[in-house]
Swiss-Prot record:
Gene3D superfamilies: Ribonuclease Inhibitor (3.80.10.10). Residues 763-781 have a biased composition (Acidic residues). It is found in: Cell membrane. GO terms for cellular component: plasma membrane. Residues 31-786 are extracellular. This is Receptor-like protein 48. The gene is RLP48. Keywords: Cell membrane, Glycoprotein, Leucine-rich repeat, Membrane, Receptor, Repeat, Signal, Transmembrane, Transmembrane helix. PROSITE patterns: LRR (PS51450). Residues 1-30 form the signal peptide. LRR repeats lie at residues 111-134, 136-159, 160-182, 196-219, 220-244, 245-260, 261-285, 288-310, 311-335, 336-359, 361-381, 382-405, 406-432, 434-450, 451-473, 475-498, 500-521, 523-544, 545-571, 572-595, 642-666, 667-690, 691-714, 716-739.
């Protein structure tokens, strides 16, 4: 028999075993919290998209690739569940490399307990389905920087718990104020704004929304941030925005005596079509920290700038490019002691030499303000980080004290009349833009010591000498533009930095070869070496730069073939290809353009490169530019044109053989110039597939055969030139072709028909036959008319004789 102590020991052991088993069971349950229906919905959602990096500038994590069946979905990357119910409540897939549309029957909408849905910075395309309204517990929703378009679904207005809505940087549209003919009918967007009574944060910026804001916005009583900038909204700001219930003010409007309990702290309404006076009611929003009213159309009226003096909490104020004739004293804004960012671009400014400004200001943008002297007050702006005084009328040298400001990093002094040698820049400089001035001398080697330099733009000055060899030491530079100076010599062999995205050295006197070390610049998008003396073969190695979008080699001394069996070209993102006015030779194979997908029908489906990377730096204040031949004239393409303008120019070379049939797959092409070569054969009928083509130049070649009548289907084709070839036959009668000047068909002896005066042979025979037939018909008609005349005379004669005899008989009786 067991003793009592042994029995107690056994009891303890069994109790411990039981506790251990129960705890394991509980841990097992806790470990596998995910519900099967939630797991299935997530896995189906994963399979609705394919995962692939789509933008070299925006790194993404392939989060959904780690999701596996038969594992706890609540422990998956970017997924959060309610610990009590096992329902998925948060899905954060921002920058997760997702590509594809969001379908209306997506399994996402089965996750009906979602409270937070973050899908921004993905390549999610198509229309945002109404099914989004099924997620009725959503508190936060973000599709920022996707590829969504169409109308914002009205079902968003049913999300009564929603506090954060971000649909910015898409292509959403909305009805205009008169699109339905009923000005009293609320649009879907207006209904959404009226129903989101719990929302604190709304960001609809950078879309294509238009129309007017709803007249009654007082229901948005909890609004903290409201961003509708960079759209096409019109009309005026509804007064209800300044009358939300929490506002409280009394007494006369004097500086400092307005009090408000409004939650509204961020209001971005810039870059729309708002018009009329800026409402004085803005002064009631004394809690505002950020305010943007840029590009407001006051109708050249006078702006009452005293409105802004009440906004003592302002940290950021953007009043750039107001359409006003008002001149304002910059000292007007010196009372805003919390101001960190101020943009008054496009406003006529008066700046006193004794001006004292808040030293806390970090960003100051005074572009196009008619400033004639370098502002002296800047010497005391010890916190200045970003300075833009471009497009003014400032002459002389840049004062040396500017470079002693300890935090200065971004400087834009372009489009002035600064002269002298380039100043010695401080190590803090990250971006220096000094284009379109009168700087001269050599580029100083001290520039190479700027270890943080990302952007250097010295275009359109009078610099001479060679590109410093020490440029090879750059490690961080991304944009280097030395365009239109008098630089000579050869490129540094190890150019420039592997981080380079944009290089423009066009319109100089550079010689030698294009440095093959550029092959290391895997992020290079923009390469322009036009109008130099570069003597080299075609750089086939550029094909390895998969991000290259603009390639301009025109007006140099490049030579040799542009096709090689060993080095076939494939430019998946190329938008502009200009190799004109060189000495290229050889034949192009039929499939030469097969790999140029950015100009084909699949263009840009997964290309989300933000314009800022193509256009320039820091909010787009600098823009790339190239000179292209379009419709027979040279034109400068600047800024956003790069994103939509697709052109191929191989003119002025010695290319021969047939025009490649594969040219017909480049359906996004807008300009095609193959003139002044030695192309032979027929004009390929596949050109009729270029449905976006606006300009076509095939002149000065040796083309034969007829002009394909199918070209008449190209409704956007405004200009074409077939002159100086060996074409023959009738000129097609399509309107697009017949509207051209006769010079577009000159020196083709075999061409005939309008707009030429000479008729085609068949046309002359047809006209003679038609004329003879008309003469025969006229003669036959004349004979018939004579017969009818005799019959009519006979008909009239018989009754006349009868009546005459009858009357005579009566009279004699």
């Amino acid at each position: 028999m067991h003793s009592c102590s042994e029995r107690r020991m056994m009891t303890v052991i069994w109790s411990l075993c039981l506790i251990f088993c129960l705890s394991n069971s509980i841990l097992a349950i806790a470990k596998d919290l995910c519900l099967p229906d939630q797991r299935d919905a997530l896995l189906e959602f994963k399979n609705e998209f394919y995962v692939q990096e789509f933008d070299p500038h925006m790194k993404c994590e392939k989060a959904t690739e780690t999701w596996r069946n038969k594992t706890d979905c609540c422990s998956w990357n970017r997924v959060s569940c309610d610990p009590k119910t096992g329902k998925v409540v948060e899905l954060d897939l921002m920058s997760s490399c997702l590509n594809g549309p969001l379908r209306s029957n997506s399994s996402l909408f089965r996750l009906q307990h979602l409270q937070s849905l973050e899908l921004s910075s993905n390549n999610i395309s198509g229309i945002l389905p109404d099914s989004i309204g099924n997620l009725k517990y959503l508190r936060s929703l973000s599709f920022r920087t996707c590829h969504l378009f169409g109308k914002i679904p009205s079902s968003l207005g049913s999300l009564s718990y929603l506090t954060h809505l971000d649909l910015s940087y898409n292509d959403f549209t909305s009805e205009g104020p008169d699109s339905g003919g009923n000005l009293n009918r609320l649009t879907d967007l207006q209904l959404v704004l009226l129903n989101l009574s719990s929302v604190t944060w709304i960001d609809l910026g950078s879309n294509q929304l238009k129309g007017m804001l709803p007249s009654n916005m007082s229901s948005l009583s909890k609004l903290v941030s409201f961003d509708i900038s960079e759209n096409s909204f019109s009309g005026s700001i509804p007064s209800s925005l300044f009358m939300i219930p929490s506002l409280n003010f009394s007494g006369p409007l004097e500086i400092g005596n307005i009090s408000s309990h409004s939650e509204l702290g961020y209001l971005y309404m810039g870059e729309n079509n708002f018009n009329g006076p800026i409402p004085g009611s803005l002064s009631k929003l004394v809690g505002l920290r950020d305010l943007s009213l840029s590009f407001w159309n006051t109708g050249r009226g006078i702006v009452d700038f005293s409105i802004f003096l009440h906004l003592k909490s302002l940290c950021s104020l953007d009043l750039s490019y107001l359409n006003t004739r008002s001149m304002v004293d910059l000292s007007f804004f010196s009372h805003l002691m919390s101001l960190d960012e101020l943009d008054l671009s496009g406003i006529n400014l008066k700046i006193s030499s004794t001006l004292s400004f808040p030293s806390a200001t970090g960003t100051l943008i005074l572009a196009s303000c008619n400033i004639v002297e370098f502002p002296k007050f800047l010497e005391n702006q010890t916190s200045l980080f970003y300075l833009d005084i471009s497009a003014n009328h400032i002459e002389g040298q840049v004062p040396e004290w500017l470079w002693r400001l300890p935090t200065l990093s971004f400087v834009n002094i372009a489009q002035n009349s600064f002269s002298g040698e380039l100043p010695m820049l401080p190590n803090s400089i990250y971006s220096f833009i000094a284009s379109d001035n009168q700087f001269s001398g050599e580029i100083p080697r001290t520039v190479c010591e700027l270890v943080s330099l990302n952007t250097l733009v010295l275009s359109n000055n009078k610099f001479s000498g060679s590109i410093p060899r020490c440029f090879e030491n750059f490690k961080t530079i991304s944009i280097l533009h030395l365009r239109n100076n008098s630089l000579s010599g050869v490129f540094p062999k190890e150019i420039i930095s592997e981080t380079l995205t944009s290089l423009d050295v066009g319109h100089n006197w550079l010689s030698g070869q294009l440095p093959k070390s550029l092959i290391k610049c895997t992020d290079l998008e923009f390469l322009n070496v036009e109008d130099n003396r570069i003597n080299d073969k075609f750089p086939f190695w550029l094909r390895s730069l998969s991000n290259l979008q603009i390639l301009v080699l025109r007006s140099n001394e490049f030579y040799g073939p542009i096709f090689s069996l060993e080095d076939s070209l494939s430019f998946p993102k190329l938008r502009i290809f200009d190799i004109s006015e060189n000495h290229f030779t050889g034949v192009l194979p039929s499939d030469y353009f097969a790999g140029w997908s950015a100009m084909s029908s699949v263009v840009d489906i997964f290309d989300t490169t933000p314009q800022v990377h193509i256009l320039g730096v820091f909010q787009g204040y600098y823009h790339n530019s190239v000179v292209l031949t379009n419709k027979g004239l040279n034109m400068e393409l600047v800024g956003s044109g790069f994103t939509i303008y697709k052109t191929i120019d191989v003119s002025g070379n010695r290319l021969e053989g047939d025009i490649p049939e594969s040219i017909g797959i480049l359906k996004e092409l807008i300009v095609l110039n193959m003139s002044n070569n030695a192309f032979t054969g027929h004009i390929p009928p596949s050109l009729s597939n270029l449905s976006n083509l606006q300009s076509l130049d095939l002149s000065q070649n040796r083309l034969s055969g007829s002009i394909p009548p199918e070209l008449g289907k190209l409704t956007f084709l405004e200009w074409m030139n077939f002159s100086y070839n060996r074409l023959e036959g009738p000129i097609p009668q399509a309107t697009q072709i017949q509207s051209q000047n006769s010079s577009s068909f000159a020196e083709n002896p075999g061409l005939c028909g309008a707009p030429f005066l000479n008729k085609c042979g068949g046309e002359e025979e047809e006209e003679e036959e038609a004329t003879k037939q008309e003469e025969d018909e006229d003669e036959e008609k004349e004979e018939k008319n004579q017969v009818f005349s005799w019959i009519a005379a006979a008909i009239g004669y018989v009754p006349g004789v009868f009546c005459g005899l009858t009357i005579a008989h009566i009279l004699t009786s």
